[in-house]
Amino acid sequence: MSSSNGRGGAGGVGGSSEHPQYPKVVLVTGACRFLGGYLTARLAQNPLINRVIAVDAIAPSKDMLRRMGRAEFVRADIRNPFIAKVIRNGEVDTVVHAAAASYAPRSGGSAALKELNVMGAMQLFAACQKAPSVRRVVLKSTSEVYGSSPHDPVMFTEDSSSRRPFSQGFPKDSLDIEGYVRALGRRRPDIAVTILRLANMIGPAMDTTLSRYLAGPLVPTIFGRDARLQLLHEQDALGALERAAMAGKAGTFNIGADGILMLSQAIRRAGRIPVPVPGFGVWALDSLRRANHYTELNREQFAYLSYGRVMDTTRMRVELGYQPKWTTVEAFDDYFRGRGLTPIIDPHRVRSWEGRAVGLAQRWGSRNPIPWSGLR
């Protein structure tokens, strides 16, 4: 595993960070979720920080509350103007917004999800704008803002955009939220705004759509396609958020592990059985859902499982000064081992079968060549 880099220069989204200072009072939203809760615990253990305030609309579990240590928990919905009072009275100088959810509540669907994410962010950033003590805002965003398509570049840079505009859903909400926090940086140029676009996260403790998708004995795949996966270990996601909160580097940063893993390789490493399904529009999406007995997959996730997504992380290393400890392959292997998943079939045997199949196909092809004019 690689070790952490040195420090880098400042980015360019709102605020100046030529002489960054350590935060004294940090507020973390989404404190009852994995990232928010464990980030709160990390920051509370840092003696350079005087006070950590954890905020969520629901009460944390006893275990999470214990992990938070000296952090103060405030039960508050960030959609409520009360959040402004919490920031003002607490003299908060650094806000880490980690509360955005990628899945809808049990009732309400996408409309409820948009209400939670977008309206909450608007209220929170408005409160930050009015609070003279706030000097730093860190937003946990997502690589999903780039989308996935057959026309994607080899790697997305922070200046790239999706090849297909989003009309709704979590990627659209995430882009809107990024726009609101950039507007905050323009209105308050003394606030350093940091946006972290996290790659798809995976690990032994974090529960995500991708981790559940790969945990089943039968893993549906899109026939004829093999997605390129760039992952991010859950601990590296926490490390990046902590680094951003402490460093105060303004800018937008892609956060992802080194290397890629093809979906077919991931399935083999896990000893799972791939189940190809047809790739014809909505029917393919429905087939994927039925084959996996799983209804959470939406259009964007379907595209990701078809084409994948890879980001350029140069700015993360050079400017933010952060280097993930786990590579993509190491992150996947740690997830698989940590979950205690038992291979359905021996991965070595799968590779042996695959090698034989490729050999047979090559021999058959040499005896039965297909003229190029016949391909369309």
Curated annotation (Swiss-Prot):
<dbReference type="InterPro" id="IPR001509">
    <property type="entry name" value="Epimerase_deHydtase"/>
</dbReference>
<dbReference type="GO" id="GO:0005576">
    <property type="term" value="C:extracellular region"/>
</dbReference>
<dbReference type="InterPro" id="IPR050177">
    <property type="entry name" value="Lipid_A_modif_metabolic_enz"/>
</dbReference>
<dbReference type="Pfam" id="PF01370">
    <property type="entry name" value="Epimerase"/>
</dbReference>
<dbReference type="GO" id="GO:0005829">
    <property type="term" value="C:cytosol"/>
</dbReference>
<protein>
    <recommendedName>
        <fullName>Uncharacterized protein Rv0501</fullName>
    </recommendedName>
</protein>
<comment type="similarity">
    <text>Belongs to the NAD(P)-dependent epimerase/dehydratase family.</text>
</comment>
<dbReference type="GO" id="GO:0005886">
    <property type="term" value="C:plasma membrane"/>
</dbReference>
<dbReference type="InterPro" id="IPR036291">
    <property type="entry name" value="NAD(P)-bd_dom_sf"/>
</dbReference>
